[in-house]
Amino acid sequence: MQITPFGITKNGETVRADTLRCGKNSATLLDRGATLHALCIAGTDVVLGFDSIGAYERNDAYLGAVIGRYANRIAGGFTLGGIYYPLAANDTDHGVHLHGGVVGFDRKIFCAEPYAALDGAGEGIRFTLFSEDGDQGYPGNLSLCVSYFLDAQGLMIRYEARCDKDTPLNLTNHSYFCLDGKNITTHTLQLFAGTYAKTDARLIVTDPCVSVAGTPLDFRSETSLAEALAAQSPVFEFAGGIDHNFNLDKTAPGQPCGNATLFPAAVLRAGQRSMTVLTNFPCMQVYTANFLHGKDPMKNGSLPSRHAAICFETQEAGADAPSRGEAILRADTLYCRTAKFLFAGFDA
């Protein structure tokens, strides 16, 4: 594993970059936000990112970062154990709490240490973080471990956590994927999900289980993203594209992964290239970078732009789930979830 300095934050924190390698694949992670900065498959970088820590700080797109304590949105706050916990409305466009707050996990410096597979096939890194009681308004002292492991097939992310009080927990990684270096209008998508969560103008869930049938969100068979995004449909009224939480079917054959079974969630294709998402998370927020913009150029020299990439945010539930009594980690209970991103066709 190669370790290099990446920069210094405006608060004076030193940020480092760790690069994992396995054959023709490499992954570069930043300790700020446990961020997936680059993922090169046979020489092709398939995730968006910036070249400087200043650019990451200036932009609020959460590129490649681990999100917590609560990925997605919460309307105002939540009640837990008879106590109401107000949360800051850091998404000012929609007036809601977004992705864990003003200083979510994406803006924190994690501790990093390498780890290796028992068979030696690949390289890994483990990021740990302590989130104190009251951090961004959430109850309980939370210990978090996020592990990345790179092998010849792709990248695995494992999330483990424990808290001394009941607390909402909805962890994810917010990487933006593009398989051909262009934009996602050249891609097709298949989702293993027959229902999604309907939202209001604030992107807060109003119905957590609506059929995708007859809507542009029906990706149960391989579908052109360009055609889906061009559809004139009420489902795109508030988000300007796909920014919806899908309930994963888990009906296709699963893949053993340690003590867990991972099920297909998505297949993204661009020509001969493909990425398959496997997970044991029950839900996944799919986001087509509808609000992506900015003046800082990305690694490839282009400016952040709408539909430049797509996010597969595997998670526990959709927006405002704590208000429905969902996505709650009970005190002294071990939380463990995994997501895998497998690649094919990059040598063709």
Task: List the model feature ranges, each with a label.
Residues M1-A348:
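An exposed, glycine/acidic-rich loop-and-rim segment of catalytic or binding clefts
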